[in-house]
Swiss-Prot record:
Belongs to the Mediator complex subunit 18 family. This is Mediator of RNA polymerase II transcription subunit 18. It is found in: Nucleus. Component of the Mediator complex, a coactivator involved in the regulated transcription of nearly all RNA polymerase II-dependent genes. Mediator functions as a bridge to convey information from gene-specific regulatory proteins to the basal RNA polymerase II transcription machinery. The Mediator complex, having a compact conformation in its free form, is recruited to promoters by direct interactions with regulatory proteins and serves for the assembly of a functional pre-initiation complex with RNA polymerase II and the general transcription factors. The keyword Protein transport does not apply. PANTHER family: MEDIATOR OF RNA POLYMERASE II TRANSCRIPTION SUBUNIT 18, MEDIATOR OF RNA POLYMERASE II TRANSCRIPTION, SUBUNIT 18. GO terms for biological process: abscisic acid-activated signaling pathway; carpel development; defense response; DNA-templated transcription termination; ethylene-activated signaling pathway; miRNA processing; negative regulation of DNA-templated transcription; petal development. Keywords: Abscisic acid signaling pathway, Developmental protein, Ethylene signaling pathway, Nucleus, Plant defense, Transcription, Transcription regulation, Transcription termination. GO terms for cellular component: mediator complex; nucleus. Signal peptide: none annotated. The gene is MED18. InterPro entries: Mediator_Med18. One of its GO terms (molecular function) is transcription coregulator activity. The keyword Nucleotide-binding does not apply.
Length: 219
């Protein structure tokens, strides 16, 4: 079973440019544009008593949109999990064809909700393969109405940091993610997705400093 380590936070849109400068300096790679249509599907009663949820992700930034299916399992629990500052959970992910949505509907899944995430991402190697995405999360007034999407939280953007892991190395991966997040702390507080921490009081001052000196150093 594949696993992933995850932390999440929020940042005011006015400070996103400063965060991008910081990430560019830390990661040492070019940013990638992010435009993903996410469909959350839930299983119907014909597929068992326990409801199952899968996410279909359509990457709209490709010349030909590509599709991925992702199933997020339960989070790791127990004393060990409580001592780790990141969420460690089971996860299965696979590339699929554009017919995947039709297939899930045929299996009895129903569309629960859909989102459009627009922003940018950095992918780099630092002990683990870490991905950082900064995006505006938008909802649609009508099914699949991407062009009419409106922000869920105007003026705020979501920051996600994820890294794939296994049952053998999740401790090292979690430590790498935690260490990386410390560099972002002046601008955004990152924690387990279930824990809401709000914006960072020092963000405005940190952003002003970054904008004036043009970024940091590569790790």
């Amino acid at each position: 079973m594949s696993m992933e380590c995850v932390v999440q936070g929020i940042i005011e849109t006015q400070h996103v440019e400063a965060l991008e400068i910081l990430l560019q300096g830390l990661c040492g790679v070019q940013r990638e544009r992010l435009r993903v249509h996410e469909l959350c599907l839930r299983s119907g009663p014909n597929l068992g008593v326990v409801s199952s949820e899968v996410r279909l992700l359509c990457d709209l930034d490709q010349p030909e949109p590509t599709w991925t299916v992702k199933h997020v399992g339960g989070a790791m629990r127990g004393a060990g999990a409580d001592q780790i500052s990141v969420l460690v959970r089971n996860m299965i992910e696979s590339k699929v064809s554009k017919n995947a949505l039709r297939m899930f509907y045929a299996l009895g899944y129903k569309l629960d909700h859909e989102l459009l995430k627009v922003g940018f991402a950095f992918h780099f190697q630092r002990t683990a393969h870490i991905s950082v995405s900064v995006s505006s999360v938008n909802k649609m007034p009508k099914v699949h109405a991407i062009d009419e999407a409106v922000p869920v939280t105007p003026g705020m953007q979501i920051v996600d940091v994820t890294a794939p892991a296994t049952s053998e190395n999740y401790s090292e991966v979690a430590a790498a993610v935690s260490s990386f997040c410390e560099f972002l702390a002046p601008l955004v507080h990152l924690s387990k997705p279930s824990i809401s921490t709000g914006v960072v009081p020092t963000a405005a001052a940190a952003a002003a400093s970054l904008m004036s000196d043009g970024g940091g150093t590569t790790l």
